[in-house]
Amino acid sequence: MPVWERSSTARVVPPARPRKLAKVPFVELADGRLQGVVSSGSDAGRVYVSSIATATYAFACSTNNNRPCGGARGTFCNHIRALVGEAVLQYGAERVARYLKADTPDGEPDAPRLVSVMTAARPEQGDTSAAAPVFSRFLRHLAYLELEPTTAPLPEMQWFPPTRTVA
């Protein structure tokens, strides 16, 4: 384990399996939702912000400029299904199922079973108000990827309390 990781207060969790970032470049389990950014299948310049709420499975899918997804009418669209699939790759099926409170009674959870359990509950279409903050975090994530590797602290992270000196 690298020194910077040992001295960190938050552990870096490696992905359950490697995944390609072209279709779903951003996935997170946060704010009581599985949420992320999903690329459009038809337009390279368009992305969708999709989310599923914990326990209720209320879902939302809209473009980054808040236009509703045409496929998310009464059930999960392909963007949400892709989001679940990539979340399972990123975090592992057990962790995603536990976070969403989706019990798969017929064995080991995987992406199709999770989608099946959630759609069987007939979830309602949720609020799309979270799309802007999720997209903003995605853009911030992209900005961090463009930075040169360094051990110097990032200015916007200075509000974290120091735990100990870095070796």
Task: Describe each PLM feature range.
Residues 1-167:
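Long, low-complexity, compositionally biased intrinsically disordered regions
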